[in-house]
Each structure stands twice: as structure tokens, then as C-alpha cells.
Curated annotation (Swiss-Prot):
Catalyzes the phosphorylation of 5-dehydro-2-deoxy-D-gluconate (2-deoxy-5-keto-D-gluconate or DKG) to 6-phospho-5-dehydro-2-deoxy-D-gluconate (DKGP). InterPro entries: Carboh/pur_kinase_PfkB_CS, DKG_kinase_firmi, Myo_inos_IolC, Myo_inos_IolC-like_sf, PfkB_Carbo_kinase, PfkB_dom, Ribokinase-like. Belongs to the carbohydrate kinase PfkB family. It comes from Bacillus cereus (strain ZK / E33L). It is an enzyme of class 2 (transferase). The keyword ATP-binding applies. Its EC number is 2.7.1.92. The lineage of its organism: Bacteria, Bacillati, Bacillota, Bacilli, Bacillales. This is 5-dehydro-2-deoxygluconokinase 2. Keywords: ATP-binding, Kinase, Nucleotide-binding, Plasmid, Transferase. One of its GO terms (biological process) is inositol catabolic process.
């Protein structure tokens, strides 16, 4: 059963809010970053990747965010426009803030890392006054990402967007997206992540991310069922807990759980899997699919993206996912 009810006759299916950055992915693999000489530039940031993926699958998508007033900011905005994402609510920073950069290192499929430059970034300067209630109420769903909660004024802008979404019956997806380098402490992170999760209809995160959110509760051990049930006393209708190569489990308020598997593929790198999973999972739910079907789409999309060099450029179409699912071995 799909417990989500989406409004009808909205010009937008999904609005994402938060991080817009640039990924610089290593062209030379099987070597450390110190020995890497060339990189390829892509648009990045978890909410950006998810919005791009959802659009490529057929959703009408918009974005609320802030970019730097320079070549990188213009590159991001133009890329989103070229990929049919509404950019009416992307603001330009006038304070001299810069675009966040993510350099990737691909030593092996199992050994990948990211070097982030996140000082004085434009996306965290998004102000509450730049969040339009009218824009949000025109959408069926809102996607928020945890990184946007790391600092003010972006933090307050996200919470205002959440309030507008709740007011206008907009379904809220929360992609936890925990990046330690943007936070002062795990305690600070847990406080704001918990506040956001309480207002969300669907929460998607890894087991490790949920463990971080539960730091303040002093649980003796991780328990997926206990984690999910905690959020059902608030707004949550679906809680998805991801376990990497072991797949994922989706819990619903009526006590059901659904296990999602993975599809075998030739892995190039590990990053991008979560964003591609989320985009296809959200798409499936918004198309009225049952949760297990939406999870299969997410798993297939993730396997496609980790086999390719980029994240945003590699986001698949519905036809590409269908073709992949016909030939790939599924492990549940």
C-alpha cells in the first residue's frame, strides 16, 4: 500500500530546497587524489541530484536555492534550466560567497572519498525572505536535505519552507544527507535533524545517519523497527532505512515493512547511489506505485549511477531503468 496522498492539478510535482554545488570527479581512477591530474565538472549537491533525477524520470520539478554570483553559479543555473528544472526561485548571492566544491577520489570501487570545500558557500546564505509561500503551495511535494540545516540563515529558510508545506498539504520528503564537515558537533546536528524529521512525511537515511539522529536518546543498540516507530508519532508515514549493499527497508505507520534489494552492476564508484535511489523512489511513489515497486526503481537507479562517472549526468530515464531491470540480477 502507498499511504501518500498528493494534491492534484499542481503545476509542479516536486520542489527541492538546499545545496547547489559543483562536483569535480577524478578522471584518473585507481590512484589517490594527490596523483590525479584532471577532473570533470558536474552539477552536484544531494537535492540538486535528486531534482535532476526526478525530472529525467518525468516529474515537473522546481528548486529553491542560492548560487554564487560568478561563473560557477551561472553554470549551475544554466544546467538546471537545460534539464527542464524551474529556476524561478534560485537566488543570486551578492555578498561574495562562493560555490561549494566536491573533489572526488576513486582509488577503487570500494575505496572512494570526497574532499569538500564548504567555507563561505552561497547555498547556506538562502534567507527566509527568499522562500515563497505561493511557490511551495503550487507543488505536490517538497524535498528537503539535511545539509541545508547546517547554518543560518539557510536553516531558518528550510524550516519556513516546511511550515508552508504543512500549511498547504504539500507532502514532505526528508533526505537526511549527513555531511559531518558542515556541522560543529553531532549533538547540534541531531537537534536540527530531529526537528525537521518531525515535520516530514517520508524520511530517507542510512542506518548510520539514523544512529546519529538518535545520539541524544542514548539507545543501547540500533534497531530499525524502533527507529521507524519513533517517527510515526509525528507526521511520518514512511521511513526508509538504507543498509548499503544489503539493500533497504521501508516501514509504514500501519506496521508493515518492505525489504528492497540491490541490482548487480559493475561498480565504478560508490557516491551518487543515495541520490539516485531517492529520485526514483520518490518518482515511483508519486506515480502511485506500491512501496516495494518504488523501492525496486530506486535500487535499479542507484546501480546505474554507481556504474558511471558522474552523479547528475548519469541519472537515468524511466526507459533506461526498465531496460536495466530486465537484464540485471536482483538480490533481495
Amino acid at each position: 500500500m502507498n499511504p501518500l496522498i498528493f494534491k492534484e492539478d499542481c503545476p509542479l510535482d516536486l520542489i527541492a530546497v538546499g545545496r547547489l554545488c559543483v562536483d569535480l570527479n577524478a578522471n584518473e581512477t585507481q590512484r589517490p587524489m594527490e596523483a590525479t591530474r584532471t577532473f570533470t565538472k558536474y552539477v552536484g549537491g544531494s537535492p540538486a541530484n535528486i531534482a535532476i533525477g526526478a525530472t529525467r524520470l518525468g516529474l515537473q520539478t522546481g528548486f529553491i536555492g542560492k548560487v554564487s554570483d560568478d561563473q560557477m553559479g551561472r553554470f549551475i543555473t544554466r544546467y538546471l534550466q537545460d534539464n527542464n528544472i524551474n529556476t524561478d526561485q534560485i537566488c543570486i548571492d551578492r555578498t561574495g560567497a562562493v560555490t561549494g566544491l566536491a573533489f572526488t577520489e576513486i582509488k577503487s570501487p570500494e575505496d572512494c572519498s570526497i574532499l569538500m570545500y564548504r567555507d563561505n558557500v552561497a547555498d547556506l546564505n538562502l534567507d527566509p525572505t527568499e522562500v515563497s509561500e505561493d511557490y511551495i503551495k503550487q507543488s505536490k511535494a517538497l524535498l528537503i536535505s539535511g545539509t541545508a540545516l547546517a547554518k543560518s540563515p539557510s536553516r531558518e529558510a528550510v524550516f519556513l519552507a516546511l511550515e508552508y508545506a504543512r500549511k498547504h498539504d504539500v507532502v514532505v520528503f526528508f533526505d537526511v544527507d549527513y555531511r559531518p564537515y558542515t556541522w560543529q558537533s553531532e549533538a547540534e546536528t541531531a537537534v536540527y535533524y530531529n526537528l525537521a524529521a518531525e515535520k516530514s512525511d517520508v524520511i530517507i537515511g542510512t542506518r548510520e545517519e539514523f544512529d546519529m539522529m538518535e545520539k541524544l536518546l542514548n539507545y543501547e543498540e540500533s534497531n530499525d523497527q524502533v527507529t521507524a516507530e519513533r517517527w510515526f508519532s509525528h507526521h511520518a508515514k514512511i521511513v526508509v532505512i538504507k543498509h548499503g549493499g544489503d539493500g533497504s527497508i521501508a516501514y509504514t505507520r500501519d506496521g508493515q515493512s518492505h525489504r528492497g534489494g540491490i541490482f548487480k552492476t559493475k561498480v565504478l564508484k560508490t557516491f551518487g547511489a543515495g541520490d539516485s535511489y531517492a529520485s526514483a523512489f520518490i518518482y515511483g511513489l508519486m506515480q502511485g506505485l506500491e512501496i516495494p515497486q518504488a523501492m525496486r526503481l530506486g535500487g535499479a537507479s542507484a546501480s546505474i549511477v554507481i556504474s558511471k562517472h558522474s552523479c547528475s549526468d548519469a541519472m537515468p530515464t524511466r526507459a533506461e531503468i526498465s531496460a536495466f531491470m530486465e537484464i540485471a540480477e536482483e538480490i533481495v
